[in-house]
A protein has these predicted regions:
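A conserved catalytic-core segment of Leloir-type glycosyltransferases
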Residues: 41-92
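Short, conserved loop/helix-junction motifs that constitute active-site signature segments
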Residues: 33, 115-119
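Glycine-rich nucleotide phosphate-binding loop and flanking beta-alpha elements
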Residues: 14-15, 107-110, 130
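N-terminal subdomain of nucleotide-sugar transferases
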Residues: 1-61
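Short N-terminal targeting/anchoring amphipathic segment
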Residues: 92-110, 121-123
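Acceptor-binding helix/loop patch of EC 2.4 sugar-transfer enzymes
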Residues: 69-78, 122-140
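Short, charged/polar "capping" segments at the starts of alpha-helices
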Residues: 47-53, 110-112, 132
Length: 140
């Protein structure tokens, strides 16, 4: 039986698992690992959360991308939390194979509808109703 793989695009580094969203991501990664699924974890760096070697125990690979902050990323039709997590390096890594992709939270969804990922199994998992909050913030 061939190995099973999955890409998980996380909005933050899920170590230590010490607040809501990253708790969910971390235990999902650990559970998938225990089920024999090879996890390719893609994390956006965020102030106060450093790359974590602890994640290597549960992942085939852990890749880190800088979050791009500043006014330029706020001038987008996409929410700031999404546009500031745009990374062509992430896209290059996702295009190396055809494994399914799990986008964790609205933050990580910049490439969800990218035509380069057409035909790929993609799952968007929201942990809150952030889309409502940001839509109403946009209307104001």
């Amino acid at each position: 039986m061939p190995d099973k793989h999955i890409h998980i695009v996380s909005f933050d580094i899920p170590w230590p698992p010490n607040y809501g969203g990253v708790i969910d991501v971390f235990y999902k990664v650990r559970t998938l690992h225990r089920l024999g699924i090879k996890v390719h974890l893609h994390c956006y760096e965020y102030p106060g959360r450093d790359p974590a070697s602890e994640l290597n125990e549960f992942c085939k690979e852990v890749l880190y991308y800088p979050r791009k902050t500043g006014i330029l990323y706020a001038l987008s039709l996409k929410p700031y939390i999404v546009s500031s997590r745009r990374s062509e390096e992430l896209m290059k890594n996702l295009l190396k194979d055809d494994h399914p992709i799990l986008f964790e939270g609205l933050h990580s969804c910049y490439y969800l509808d990218d035509p380069r990922l057409a035909g790929r199994i993609k799952v968007y998992r929201e942990s809150n109703i952030e889309h409502r909050y940001y839509f109403n913030l946009f209307k104001v």
